[in-house]
Amino acid sequence: MNAPEILNGATAAAPAGTGEATPVHARARSPLTRREQKEAYENNKLFKRLARQVGEAIVDFNMIEDGDKVMVCLSGGKDSYAMLEILMRLRERAPINFDIVAVNLDQKQPGFPEHVLPEYLKQLDIPFHIENQDTYSIVKRLVPEGKTTCSLCSRLRRGILYRVAGELGATKIALGHHRDDILQTLLLNMFYGGKLKGMPPKLQSDDGKNIVIRPLAYVKETDLEKYAELREFPIIPCNLCGSQPNLKRAEMKALVRDWEKRFPGRIENMFNALANVVPSHLMDHKLFPFAGLRATGEADPQGDIAFDEEPCSTDSGNSTTLDGAKSIAIVQFDDL
């Protein structure tokens, strides 16, 4: 039995003497082995976690509203496949009504298997549109050899998708960026752009005509990798992006993966920090009126605590408190 069958609960084979497969609901299910039971349990937990996180993001940022027509951008990668499937499953039990239309932009890259996505989407029995635009040739012509193509390719793709959304009557454009993409963008902007800027879960397009949403904003990439493997999605690699050497985003991805492995909890804290911003403790005078600050003589609970002692976990494992709990070291800022 393969992984998709375990995830869906379909376990029986076709009856003897027939050459045709029997519909899942009509088959007599054979007992699961202990290993298959464990796999099914873990796979079900994974889907529930993904569905919960997507649902939370949709609610937290009011991504999808009653009557929306959501244009799900499908690239052929693991993230967009998972996003489409989860949104379809959530729609079945959502308290609101919304439509889904899947859209793929065929950029005419050499070797792109044009048949894969149409065949897959027909099996799902949902509306879809394949937009054929040769942006590949434009990018290769305009970008010098050895330079990264991502910026120009992204701008061309964005403009086309905005136009298609208008033609299809879509009210929301769903992109498959996940938690790790958001953190990588934050680090890229900090390290190479000098900006404290990430990737928003919801935004208005630069032309003011579209709302872009990222339903996978709370989802870890490793979970999406596991889910794609279980579902056996027909993954289509991007020969234009993935084959480019020395991409800064690849460096950030490796950095995030390394931190997550070596320092459990660090990445979660970084991600949580994006939703816990304190403008008065940054340095952007456009966000906080530093110039107008005056001593009022009244206590301010939101005031400066830069000279207070800050708890920093040592994680050394060498010292414990009387009750056996790990101690917290108090570190003064002037000692750092």
From Swiss-Prot:
Pfam families: ATP_bind_3. It is found in: Cytoplasm. It is an enzyme of class 2 (transferase). Its cofactor is Mg(2+); [4Fe-4S] cluster. Keywords: 4Fe-4S, ATP-binding, Cytoplasm, Iron, Iron-sulfur, Magnesium, Metal-binding, Nucleotide-binding, RNA-binding, Transferase, tRNA processing, tRNA-binding. One of its GO terms (molecular function) is ATP binding. Its EC number is 2.8.1.-. It comes from the Bacteria. Residues 11-31 are annotated as: Disordered. [4Fe-4S] cluster binds at C150, C153, C241. It catalyses: cytidine(32) in tRNA + S-sulfanyl-L-cysteinyl-[cysteine desulfurase] + AH2 + ATP = 2-thiocytidine(32) in tRNA + L-cysteinyl-[cysteine desulfurase] + A + AMP + diphosphate + H(+). A motif (PP-loop motif) lies at residues 75-80. Binds 1 [4Fe-4S] cluster per subunit. The cluster is chelated by three Cys residues, the fourth Fe has a free coordination site that may bind a sulfur atom transferred from the persulfide of IscS. Pathway: tRNA modification. GO terms for cellular component: cytoplasm. Catalyzes the ATP-dependent 2-thiolation of cytidine in position 32 of tRNA, to form 2-thiocytidine (s(2)C32). The sulfur atoms are provided by the cysteine/cysteine desulfurase (IscS) system. Homodimer. The thiolation reaction likely consists of two steps: a first activation step by ATP to form an adenylated intermediate of the target base of tRNA, and a second nucleophilic substitution step of the sulfur (S) atom supplied by the hydrosulfide attached to the Fe-S cluster. Belongs to the TtcA family. HAMAP family: TtcA. This is tRNA-cytidine(32) 2-sulfurtransferase. It comes from Paraburkholderia xenovorans (strain LB400). The lineage of its organism: Bacteria, Pseudomonadati, Pseudomonadota, Betaproteobacteria, Burkholderiales. The gene is ttcA.
